[in-house]
Amino acid sequence: PPPPPRLDSSAASDVYKRQLSPKLRDLMPDPRGLKDLERAAARLNAAVKAKERLAIFADYDVDGGSSAALLLDWLRQQGRDATLYVPDRIDEGYGPNVPAMEGLAADHDLIVCVDCGTLSFDAIGAAKAADVVIIDHHLAEVELPSAFAVVNPNRQDETGELSHLCAAAVVFMVLVEANRQIRADSQAPPDLMGMLDLVALATVADVAPLTGLNRALVTQGLKVMSSRSRPGLTALADVAGLDTPPAAYHLGYVIGPRVNAGGRVGRADLGARCLAATDPDEARALADRLDELNRDRREIEAQVRDAALTQAEARGLDGALVWAAGEGWHPGVVGIVAARLKEATGRPAVVIGLENGEGKGSGRSVPGVDLGSAIQKIAAEGLLIKGGGHKMAAGLTVKSDQIEAAMTRLADLLSRQGAGATGPRDLRIDAALMPGAATVDLMAQIEAAGPFGQSAPAPRFAFPDVQILHARQVGTGHLKLSFGDGLGARMEAIAFDGWTSPMGEALSQNRGQRFHLAGRLGINHWGGKQSVELRLEDAAPSG
């Protein structure tokens, strides 16, 4: 057979540069390609010019909070503001509801729904006294709500080219067009580049793929964030003890969970208010409260996680779907627990909290399996009270006596997508290292190839045949490990929530024994010094 085609050196160099140094100017499409976007931008500008009364209805997660903060920043740079409304997860549930929208429409001229609203037909219809603009990314049906504009790359009549964007990125696209219209009117528009820190946070926290446009948004957003110019993000980094320039990892695992904590186990609007804060003292007070709630969330999550895993194991982990449901499980942590089950089994997972004959659940999927469309289908079939989402994450509400039937049907639909054909969760190893080779210089080279995240994973290393020197519990159930190569080189490893896991038990009970270890590398900052640590994912006896 003929040899495969090869890139010439110039083309290869261009590919290399686009991956390592993606530029927004090279990857940013014309926002007007999205349906209703130009109309939505014009309506926003008209509201600002006429000094209309504005309200923002935002989802209670990081993407919703970041989207709301983006809009508020843009408005405030023009001397305007808006009422912020974030629904209570338990009392109101996801998305716009009739009482809230009727109330907002009574004393506002324009309501902008961000990261929600695409399936809220009754609630949008109830807001007749105001115009409603929806900026969302969740899967839509053929029919759309009766809003002034619905900007959503996952509308059925869209091309799908931008379906990977989170809601905050879609809001950013709307504001790019709004700024274009402002410049066309010979006015100076707000600074959008300085808002990319919020877009980066939402993109990573919502597990959007870090490829193409998303990669450029996150790369630039991390640069903006390192300037510590946004009081809310600065305060969140400080309460988390983050004293280095942030990486994508910190957005997903350090800052993101704290922003989410208010919507999960506290007051729903705390995260959005912290991100939108302009006063450093207010931002710090909100960040402190979110940090406290995040600690509460961890304790609640641990209880639900243990019960859900026990139930799922009893039901079986070899099907197309792993699921669990329990009375009194906090609806604010079921999504995190579903993510833990998905990570542990390599299969789509759904976890449902039951109360008063009704279950509220959340699901997480694996690459190549569209969970959102499957849940939307069983909702249309009448097995759910409601349900929807996107490919990798979705939510649902179901009657308690319908759970078995709904999960059976969902498993069938996911099996048709190939979910049941996946084998045991294997780790892909990129290279083998010894402790002495895991240096700060190596980490600098790895980080230069970032940002890493969904669809752009950081390299995973195996440390073969190393000796376990010490294992102990740190924090709330984390495993801290020291290991060496027997030649004098040693390093530290950490497995979050790993102390009571089978891996944690094996390592803590076999001090002095030799194991193969695998995971990704990170930098540990302690006492003014830097060292490389292994974020441990798996271990096996080497003998």
For every predicted segment, state its role.
Residues P1-Y16:
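Short, small-residue-biased leader/transition segments that mark boundaries at the very start
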Residues P2, R6, D61-S66, E161-A169, ...:
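Short, conserved micro-motifs enriched in small and acidic residues
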Residues P2-P5, H137-H138, P153, H330, ...:
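Histidine-centered active-site/metal-ligand motif
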Residues S9, V112, N260, I446, ...:
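A residue-level signal for conserved active-site and pocket-lining positions in enzyme catalytic cores
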Residues S13-D109, A129, R180-Q402:
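Hydrophobic helix-and-loop "lid/oligomerization" segment in the mid-to-C-terminal part
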Residues A50, G212, E282-A324, V369, ...:
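Mid-to-C-terminal polyanion-binding domains and interfaces
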Residues L70, P145-D185, L192-V204:
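Short alpha-helices
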Residues V114-C166:
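Histidine/acidic-residue-rich, glycine-tolerant segments that coordinate divalent metal ions
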